[in-house]
Amino acid sequence: MRELQLIGPHRLEWRERPDPTLRGPRDAIVRPFIASRCDGDTLPIHRHVSRPMQAGLRLGLIDPIVAGICGNVPFRGPFGIGHECVAEVVALGGEVTGSAVGDIVIVPWAVSCGDCVECRRGLTAKCSTTSAGVLSAFGFGPASGPWGGMVADLLRIPFADHMLVKVPDGLDPLRVAAASDNLSDAWRTVVPMLEQRPGGSVLVLGGAAQSIGLYAAGLAVAQGAGVVDYVDHRTERLEIAEKLGATAHRVPKGKLRLSDLPGRSYDVAVEGTSTAAGIDVAIRSLTPGGHCNAAGYYLPPGTKVPIMHMYGNDATLRVGISHVRPILPALLDFIAREDFPAEVVTTRVADWDDAPDAYRERTTKLVLRRPRLGAA
């Protein structure tokens, strides 16, 4: 079968791998027919980062946990890339009861069992059954397990009754192309807080977490936030934020300052710039008791946080990987019920066969598609 592999910066290729097979009665084989590019994938695609990050790890300039996720030479190719997909079930082990051949499903980016202590606590990305290290995941290379990337002809899914989440009937799969990661990640940054503070105000700092920030802004509007301010320097993303109902604010490219913001305080702030300055500004923008959710990558081990300001303002900062599997049922139900137009964030829909070229494009949200089996 074919799998899209990252060979090096700006270079991706289809490469052959053995077809996956059912290895146990709880396995499933699925065929992805829609895949989207995670915001984080653009880092190794568009930049020469492997050797600089290796040096940074050696010199203590990058937190050592990065090696546990991406390897001692982070993002060194070739490896299968991609960890967001909508797939069709094509084969099932004998003990799988929750899915049927032909079902359309979301596959979470992190591989989890559903039964261990971590999974029962909702920390499915930290599953102790599937991971011997930091993560067990699709699309991050061998350090995160043998699963390969999701831009592939077929995938083996262990613990299928737990892992596979059916897409509601009538819901366009293109609308939930990023539900495996970025769309769910955005959900957890705003919706739980707005459920606690109905009508609350939301600030989104857009940037490196390109689609996450936009999904978060749109979900906040759909959840009934009283104010949703989206701050960014890039025209394409500002226009998308406005289409989703947020108020867009252009700021200069470069280090973000508190004076760049609209001049009010917020119940919820989503930090998507992946910078220490963004963390500082987001925290200082909060109302008393406000929540800042950081959705970026913060590689240096000494990223500064204004702890005393947080103390005085009773602020909460949440940083952590996304635990998608527990989120998916509520997210999919919300999108179907509220007709949330997540596809507005998609800036390029490309043919599946064109993946090596399409994945190199500099665009906010890339989605690949091909026909379902038997589709006309």
Tell me what each language-model feature is.
Residues 296-314, 330-331:
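Rossmann-fold NAD(P)-binding glycine/threonine-rich loop
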Residues 286-287:
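Helix-to-beta-strand junctions that scaffold the AdoMet/dcAdoMet cofactor pocket
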Residues 104, 166-254:
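Mid-domain Rossmann-like dinucleotide-binding core that forms the NAD(H)/NADP(H) cofactor-binding site
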Residues 235, 276, 280, 325-376:
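C-terminal hydrophobic helical "lid"/dimerization subdomain
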Residues 20-35, 50-120, 148, 168:
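Glycine-rich beta-strand-centered segment in the early N-terminal region that forms part
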Residues 63-83, 113-205:
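NAD(P)H dinucleotide-binding glycine-rich loop of Rossmann-like/cofactor-binding domains
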Residues 290-291:
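Glycine-centered, small-residue-biased loops immediately flanking beta-strands
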Residues 259-269:
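A short acidic, Gly/Pro-enriched loop at the edge of an enzyme's catalytic core
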